[in-house]
């Protein structure tokens, strides 16, 4: 692994093992990141199996080309540099119309958080950026400096669930009238100034939820996850499985809802029989999310909010 892209994989064995890997199957890692899940999944495949890896961050792909070299040399890996919302079109272009399993590790990866110049973290001073795809046009700077007050309030409430969204948006509006807000530290200080003193004494950084909200907006994370998971459920072969790791309530709620819609039937109660074409195509593998073990929680602080949900295809 390259030094620049160190990433501790969360729920490594649980996520892959729950896919019930077939050695000669076709699998997708929709969020390559540090390639931890990919490496473990590939170790379960024979040379007839294949893994398609998506990431929009070229640095993640460069790292994986080193880490997964032995499997690449055997022709077992294909990298796709694109947003996973384009899952189906990319796979179809490669002649893949059905898959045996897919995994998602949603949210920002550790290397992106740790790389100061990417501008994701309130803990390190950097230019406001937060793009997972460095070729994308919209940045955190654009959101903070150009979004109208009402739009800032909307995304802070919707994606950050911060009860001081209005006060924070007003402080941002006032500050940018004097000069543009350019760095993560500047923004974090403005957020802190908008919150009452008793809030600042609470556990956790006062800027965490707002930084999350801006990051989700910049990368359209929830929109992309919604589209991609729906495409994944469609692509799965019968008995194929999908594993999704989430790190905050918005992602988990979305995943839970998508799985629920696919695994339940929307018909009037009391019908003596449900027609074949109305039967659900998906079944939940775990009704309650799988959480990290105590051992993992102690070893990796970033695993604390992780939840794993798994579903399987039961008919086409």
UniProtKB/Swiss-Prot annotation:
UniProt record, GO biological process: rRNA base methylation
Binding residues for S-adenosyl-L-methionine: 35-37, 55, 84, 105, 112
One GO CC annotation: cytoplasm
Record EC number: 2.1.1.199
Superkingdom in the source lineage: Bacteria
Reaction equations catalysed: cytidine(1402) in 16S rRNA + S-adenosyl-L-methionine = N(4)-methylcytidine(1402) in 16S rRNA + S-adenosyl-L-homocysteine + H(+)
Keyword line: Cytoplasm, Methyltransferase, rRNA processing, S-adenosyl-L-methionine, Transferase
Enzyme category, top tier: transferase
GO molecular function, one term: rRNA (cytosine-N4-)-methyltransferase activity
Subcellular location: Cytoplasm
Annotated family: Belongs to the methyltransferase superfamily. RsmH family.
Matching PANTHER family: 12S RRNA N4-METHYLCYTIDINE METHYLTRANSFERASE, S-ADENOSYL-METHYLTRANSFERASE MRAW
Role this protein plays: Specifically methylates the N4 position of cytidine in position 1402 (C1402) of 16S rRNA.
Protein name in UniProt: Ribosomal RNA small subunit methyltransferase H
Source organism (scientific name): Streptococcus thermophilus (strain ATCC BAA-491 / LMD-9)
């Amino acid at each position: 692994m390259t030094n620049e892209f160190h990433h501790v994989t969360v729920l490594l064995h649980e996520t892959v093992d729950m896919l019930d890997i077939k050695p000669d199957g076709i699998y997708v890692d929709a969020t390559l990141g540090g390639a931890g899940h990919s490496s473990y999944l590939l170790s379960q495949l024979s040379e007839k199996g294949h893994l398609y890896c998506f990431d929009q961050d070229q640095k993640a792909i460069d790292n994986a080309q080193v880490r997964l070299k032995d499997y690449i040399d055997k022709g077992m890996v294909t990298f796709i540099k694109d947003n996973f919302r384009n899952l189906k079109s990319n796979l179809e272009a490669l002649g893949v119309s059905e898959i045996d399993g897919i995994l998602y590790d949603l949210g920002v990866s550790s290397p992106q958080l740790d790389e100061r110049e990417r501008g994701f973290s309130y803990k390190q001073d950097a230019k406001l950026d937060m793009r997972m795809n460095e070729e994308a046009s919209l940045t955190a700077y654009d959101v903070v400096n150009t979004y109208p007050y009402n739009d800032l309030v909307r995304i802070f409430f919707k994606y950050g669930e911060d009860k001081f969204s209005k006060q924070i948006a007003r402080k941002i509006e006032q500050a940018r009238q004097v000069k543009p807000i350019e760095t993560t530290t500047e923004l974090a200080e403005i957020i802190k100034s908008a919150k009452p003193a008793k809030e600042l004494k609470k556990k956790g950084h006062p800027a965490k939820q707002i930084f999350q909200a801006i990051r989700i907006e910049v990368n359209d994370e929830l929109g992309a996850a919604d589209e991609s998971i729906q495409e994944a459920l469609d692509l799965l072969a019968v008995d194929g499985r999908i594993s999704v790791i989430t790190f905050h309530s918005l992602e988990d709620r979305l995943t839970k809802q998508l799985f629920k819609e696919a695994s339940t039937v929307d018909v009037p109660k009391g019908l003596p029989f449900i027609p074949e074409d109305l039967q659900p195509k998906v079944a939940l593998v775990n009704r309650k999310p799988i959480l990290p073990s105590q051992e993992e929680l102690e070893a990796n602080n970033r695993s604390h909010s992780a939840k794993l949900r798994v579903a399987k295809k039961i008919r086409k």
